[in-house]
Amino acid sequence: MVLTKRIIPCLDLKDGRVVKGTHFVGLRDAGDPVELAQRYNEQGADEVVFLDITATREDRGTIIDVVQRAADQLFLPLTVGGGIRTIEDMKQILRAGADKVSINSSAVADPNLISQGAERFGTQCIVVAVDVRRNYETAPGKTPITLADGQECWYEVVTHGGSRGTGLDAVAWATEAEERGAGEILLTSMEADGTKEGFDIPITRAVSETVGIPVVASGGVGTLDHFYDGFTEGKADACLAASVFHYGEFTVRQVKEYLAGRGIPVRL
């Protein structure tokens, strides 16, 4: 059986509202995540990611409320990330109706969180988000990756929104995450993110070819071709995008029809 490739819109939330403006015609409230997610649901999205980027962690109630409302109204898988630091945080988000939780900096700080979460809730619930940046300084034990221009680098895992290097090799960290029980890797290249010049293919392919769990490519989509490249050259199992969907440049359905026309198996 051929597994279909997934298209996943991502919504960044701050204080329960969508940030990164939206230009959807006919939305009463472009800042309401549930209304926006419902629109993507109607367009045939395979799942939706809510990323809580609220700086303060005192009030988890807001995101819990959003997740509950979304889970009540949507019939598609929902992944929630941002500020999930403990098993208790995971439990609250999953109990509110999320299908998966995405952990990032907290997993780097304490890799046991991956195994504990997988043990408690099942590997299918645990997404490890890996943010990476190119590092051109040669270092022993790092996975060398050749770029399109012939330069060689390794990819370093970064945390705290890309501001903090960890010294961890991205391919090695993705492998460890899988071994510890992650069910999926959400891979974002800091170089590509926001550029609209396409996914960072070299690292996407390197991770996809190394791990046995699904890899979601994220960061850099600007054209329909970029989705195609993510699946074919990047070997990704899913492609995630934000602004191209929020600004109405394409609908999820347009992306899927384009991909189907080029022989990529998608759920239409």
Curated annotation (Swiss-Prot):
Keyword match Transport: no
Q: Which UniProt keywords are present, listed alphabetically?
A: Amino-acid biosynthesis, Cytoplasm, Histidine biosynthesis, Lyase
Its pathway? Amino-acid biosynthesis; L-histidine biosynthesis; L-histidine from 5-phospho-alpha-D-ribose 1-diphosphate: step 5/9
Domain of life of the organism encoding this protein = Archaea
Compartment annotation: Cytoplasm
Q: Which InterPro entries match?
A: Aldolase_TIM (IPR013785), His_biosynth (IPR006062), HisF (IPR004651), IGPS_HisA/HisF (IPR050064), RibuloseP-bd_barrel (IPR011060)
Record's catalysed reaction(s): 5-[(5-phospho-1-deoxy-D-ribulos-1-ylimino)methylamino]-1-(5-phospho-beta-D-ribosyl)imidazole-4-carboxamide + L-glutamine = D-erythro-1-(imidazol-4-yl)glycerol 3-phosphate + 5-amino-1-(5-phospho-beta-D-ribosyl)imidazole-4-carboxamide + L-glutamate + H(+)
Residues forming the catalytic site: 12, 131
Would you identify the family this protein belongs to, as annotated?
Belongs to the HisA/HisF family.
Subunit record text: Heterodimer of HisH and HisF.
State the name under which the record lists this protein: Imidazole glycerol phosphate synthase subunit HisF
Q: Which organism is it from?
A: Methanoculleus marisnigri (strain ATCC 35101 / DSM 1498 / JR1)
Designated gene of the protein: hisF
